Amino acid sequence: MAVCIIDHDNIRGVIYFEPVHGKDKVLGSVIGLKSGTYSLIIHRYGDISRGCDSIGSPEIFIGNIFVNRYGVAYVYLDTDVNISTIIGKALSISKNDQRLACGVIGISYINEKIIHFLTINENGV
């Protein structure tokens, strides 16, 4: 299992890469983006010393996520990515080829857990 913590400006989230019922899944949630569709992309390097400018070229398109009107995206995507090959690389959240936030993909301790998703009510709270 792998995990990526996103914490860039006001954009925050946790993205997990893990096998679920024999299929690799991308799970998590992201907050702080404007409503719309964004891309999750794996990049060549896990170097975030200069933010998203130092993560290298895009390598793997994971899929699109939709951010609701409250600025929340719930992530649940299928992927064919071999999880062991992405450890140490970066994951970016992008729109129109602009990298808005990124984080390094690391190894996550394998244990039984429940993933809690952030929920926002109709009042944005």
Swiss-Prot record:
InterPro entries in alphabetical order: SOD-like_Cu/Zn_dom_sf
SUPFAM superfamilies to which the protein is assigned, alphabetical: Cu,Zn superoxide dismutase-like
Any one GO BP annotation for this protein: superoxide metabolic process
Superkingdom, natural source: Viruses
Gene Ontology CC terms, in alphabetical order: host cell cytoplasm; virion component
UniProt key word Disulfide bond: yes
Predominant cellular place of this UniProt entry's protein: virion
S-S bonds: C52-C102
UniProt keyword annotations, A-Z: Disulfide bond, Host cytoplasm, Virion
GO MF term list: metal ion binding
Family designation: Belongs to the Cu-Zn superoxide dismutase family.
Function: Superoxide dismutase-like protein with no enzymatic activity.
Annotated protein name in UniProt: Cu-Zn superoxide dismutase-like protein OPG175
Top-level taxonomy: Viruses, Varidnaviria, Bamfordvirae, Nucleocytoviricota, Pokkesviricetes
GN (gene name): OPG175
